[in-house]
Regions:
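Core beta-strand-centered patch of the WYL/Sm-like small regulatory domain
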Residues: 130-246, 250-256
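General beta-strand recognition
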Residues: 72-74, 157, 193-195, 286, ...
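Polybasic (Lys/Arg-rich)
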Residues: 234-334
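A structural signal for short hydrophobic beta-strand segments in well-ordered beta-sheet cores
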Residues: 63, 185, 215, 277-278
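Short, basic/aromatic recognition patches that contact phosphate-bearing ligands
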Residues: 1-91, 173, 326-334
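Bulky hydrophobic/aromatic content
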Residues: 81-167
Length: 334
């Protein structure tokens, strides 16, 4: 009985063996496949393996017979090729909104799409920078609930956390309950955002999904996005997110900034929670960070208008003065 059952699942184990143990550089002969099957308590003859391989090929598997580097078979095509798995793995590892635990789970699943030899070449998969990873293990459950609410046109209720300054330079987290009409989710600048409308206001808002907890779908229809945006029939996520700016680069220097407490979230999003904060008052705080002094950094600082003042270096202060004077000249002409 066990032998008959083994023969019924033999094809499944053969494709498992070819998937996990073969690639272009590592074919397996029919005899070797028989030996691998024996590890699963399945007996097979070498000649029968040829028929089994042909059945799998007829079904659609891209199994190649080769004589280089030795006689044997290997699985030539997979659902995801090696560079695709590497690319997806890098995206998962660098995504700040995916926790370290979930990152390891996802990259492990991606590795199972490769042969064991290909997986060994994925050296990058060993390293995960956990310093900026979220600790929110609810993330994927919340994404599923939010997606369901969007599909059903229902409002959602959740708690939303944000960083605040407490007792001098201590950064802590506070949470508030919100009811939101969800319209879309988007991945921007290493974070996953919910785009929606907070019921108290007549505009759109972007909320970091890694800061969302305890999502509840309400039995209440959403407020239509046409009431709070210029979109009518379709909410155009690509158009909406086009205004977001990207990363900056250049020569690294120590930059000391004086910031309004109102933009603590934006500052820690950009530079992380480990920034060294000094000179805290009821209105402002100072911090020093290594940053690229470039036109892009000038743009980022000026985006916050009077909420950021550059203390040092003088070079950066001068760049901002010059940019402000150039803008002023344009508007003085009119």
């Amino acid at each position: 009985m066990a032998a008959r059952r083994g023969q019924k699942v033999k094809l499944l184990y053969i494709i498992k063996i070819l998937t996990e143990l073969t690639d272009e550089d590592h074919p397996l002969s029919a005899t070797e496949i028989c030996e691998k099957l024996a590890a699963y308590d399945i007996t097979a003859e070498r000649k029968a393996i040829y028929d089994d391989i042909n059945c799998l090929i007829d079904f659609g598997y891209d199994i190649i017979s080769t004589r280089v580097p030795k006689n044997g078979y290997f699985l030539a095509s997979r659902d995801f090729e090696l560079p695709e798995v590497f690319l997806l793995g890098d995206a998962v590892r660098t995504a700040k909104f995916i926790s370290e635990k979930k990152t390891r789970e996802l990259t492990s699943k991606l590795d199972r799409l490769l042969s064991k030899y290909q997986s060994k070449r994925n050296i990058q998969g060993i390293y995960i920078d956990s310093s900026n990873k979220t600790h929110n293990e609810e993330l994927f459950y919340n994404i599923d609930r939010i997606n369901t609410a969007i599909a059903e046109g229902k409002k959602i209720k959740f708690t939303y956390s944000k960083r605040v300054l407490r007792e001098g330079r201590q950064i802590t987290t506070e949470s508030k309950t919100r009811v939101v009409s969800p319209y879309a989710m988007t991945w921007q600048f290493d974070y996953y955002y919910l785009i929606g409308n907070y019921e108290k206001y007549n505009n759109l808002m972007n909320l970091r999904i890694d800061r969302i907890h305890s999502v509840e779908i309400l039995d209440e229809p959403i407020r239509h996005f046409r009431e709070v945006s210029d979109y009518r029939d379709t909410f155009d996520v690509a158009d909406y997110t086009k205004k977001l700016f990207g990363m900056f680069g250049g020569n690294m220097q120590e930059v000391k900034l004086r910031c309004s407490n109102k933009i603590l979230e934006q500052v820690t999003d950009r530079f992380g929670d480990s920034i060294f904060i000094t000179n805290v008052t009821d209105a402002t705080f100072d911090f020093t960070v290594k940053a690229a002094v470039s036109d892009a950094l000038v743009t980022w600082i000026m985006n916050y208008e009077d909420k950021i003042e550059v203390i040092t270096p003088t070079e950066l202060r001068d760049k901002i003065k010059n940019r402000a004077e150039q803008i002023l000249k344009i508007y003085k002409k009119s």
